[in-house]
Every structure is written in C-alpha cells, then in structure tokens.
Amino acid sequence: MVGDFLGANSATPLENPTIITNIIELFSMMILPVSCIFVFGRMAYDKYEESKANNSVYTLSTKNCNRANKVWMGKEGRTIFVAMSILFVIGLGVCFWSESLGNHAVAQAGVTETLGNMEGKEVRFGVAQSALFTTVTTSFTTGTVNNMHDTLTPLGGLVPLMHMMLNVVFGGAGVGLMNMLIYAIIAVFICGLMIGRTPEYLGKKIEGKEMKLAALCIIIHPLLILGFSALAVSIPEGVNGITNPGFHGLSQVLYEFASSAANNGSGFEGLVDNTLFWNMSCGIVMFLARYLPIIIQLGIAGSL
C-alpha cells in the first residue's frame, strides 16, 4: 500500500484507529461525488413541478412535502443516483461475499478461516469494513485503502477493477457524473433510433456530431488501459516489474493502468512500479484519461 508517512495509508492505527474513524473517512469520500448528482438533478428539474412544490411547501400536507423533496433532487438526479447505487450495491455484495468465503489456497494449507479472508486486512476492521472500504475507494476514486488489495480473492479483486474500468459508479467529484451523462446520451440516441424519433436529452437534440464525440469519449478510457497494458507486457522495462508469473501478474498490470486512468491511486502491490517506465507511462495515462474526456465533453456541451 502507498500513502502517508508510514506507507500504510488508512490501515495505520495512527490515522484510522477505530471503526468510527473508518466510517468518517468513508462518509468524507462519498459526500462530494453524491452531492454533484444532487446538484445536477436540481439544475435539470422540471420548472412546472418546482412551481407547484413552491406553492405547497408551507402547507402541512405530507404529499406536498414529498413532492418538494422529489423536485429538489430532480428526476434526472434520482435516475442517475439509483443507477449508480445499484452498481455500487452489487459490487459491494460480491466483494463481501467473496472475501467472507476465505482464500481456498490458505484453507488447503490447513489454516482455519472462520473470519473469512483476513490476509492483508486489519483485525480491527475485519472482512466487512475492509470490503466496504475497498468498494468505496474504487467507486469514488479516492485511492485510499485500509487493506491490501493485492491479497483480495479473485472475485473480490474484480470488483474494484470493474468499478475503475467503468468509472461511472459515482466516481470522483463530478467525474462519475460526467461519464454517466455520456452513457445517457448514447442510450437516448439508441432508443431514439429504435422508436423512430429524433433523439433528445434534456430538451437538446442528439445528432451525429454529438454521437461521434460521445463514442470517442467512451473509447478513450479502455483504449488507454488496454493499450498501455499491452505495451507493458511486451517490453523488458515493463515485464521486469511483474513479480507474479501467472494470471495475477497480468491483473496487476491491468489494475495499475486502470487505477491511473481512473485517477484512483490504489494498486495491486507487488508490482515493481517505481521505475522510469512505470512512472512515465502511468503519468501519461493519468493525464490523458483525465483531460481528454473533459475536453470532448465540453465539445459536446458546446454543440448541443
């Protein structure tokens, strides 16, 4: 693990001594990205519904109060929030279930795993808090960790890798939202073609120019991850950093560039990545994956 003076990030008891501090860190990671969704919903809500809610906000009617709350979050905000929440809950469930089953390789060595896969985890957190922290830190792209991701089970390690590759499960402050809007534009365009209507999103027509930019924006993220991963495993400078000769070695490389592209910062440690090649390649991926989508999305906004 990387980070902080001791190099243990949120696993060190000096920074994160109890479950309470762990929960505070989790909440701190989630509040800004979720707030961005609420702000978007507020900005995109129906003016007519807002007017009705404002006229009834001072009454004692529960129905009117509920209506005001719905308008405050906005229909678009609710839809995006629910979609992201479903992906988050599924990932959390899979990670916790896989980690609670334990590591079969450790079990075959004769070690009893009544607490689940505790390799690389802090005893004070256990499997539950570690799985939650792992899911949150890779969903909200903060990069902080309270356990060793490299020691996760195969399915447990798939969840953070998937969340960073999708980069739409809440994401960083505004990043997950802007990527989800690209998926929304593509979905609206496809649905419009299926029913024979001109695609529109938030009252704006979606045409060929916007779709080309949206498709380019979607392709950038996997292209950078897979392209640089292929480069790393094809040249000596990259191969020399892989310490696991099996499939997990390839997973370490994919995770490294997925984490860089998602601006996360966590990693499957064991990869000898403090070299010129890894530092330069990860820096390039980090720069391109962050600014190219922003530039393209500004282009989409300007053409609508």
Task: State where each predicted segment sits.
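Membrane-proximal intracellular helices of multi-pass ion channels
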Residues: 1-304
